[in-house]
Amino acid sequence: MIRKTEKLVITFYTTTEAMAMERLCRERMAPGRLIPVPRQISAGCGLAWCADPGCEEALTDLMRRGGITHQEIHRCLV
């Protein structure tokens, strides 16, 4: 069985915003990846950005500078 660890999960209102986040993070070599929204979270488009919890400040700053609108930021076991 795979062990779950606490992750930072950023949800988006639209798939377009989620894909923009993926593109921006790849360009800037930022950590994380797109995942389906975990069951315990009910949110927007069904896609979320998943990264280590310690990256929250850097990722929120990156989204702000990149003009990406997120829905919510969660910490949950993934």
Predicted regions and their residues:
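Short, flexible, solvent-exposed loop/turn segments with mixed acidic/basic and small polar residues
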Residues: 1-2, 34-40
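Short glycine-/aliphatic-rich beta-strand segments at the starts of folded cytosolic domains
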Residues: 2-11
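Short connector loops at helix/strand junctions that flank enzyme active sites
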Residues: 5, 27, 42-44, 68
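Small/polar loops that bind or transfer phosphate-bearing groups
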Residues: 10-13, 51
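Short amphipathic alpha-helix segments
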Residues: 14-31
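A short linear hydrophobic-aromatic micro-motif
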Residues: 31-37, 71-72
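Short proline/glycine- and acidic-rich turn/helix-capping motifs at secondary-structure junctions
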Residues: 39-45, 75-78
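C-terminal structural segments of small proteins and small subunits
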Residues: 50-78
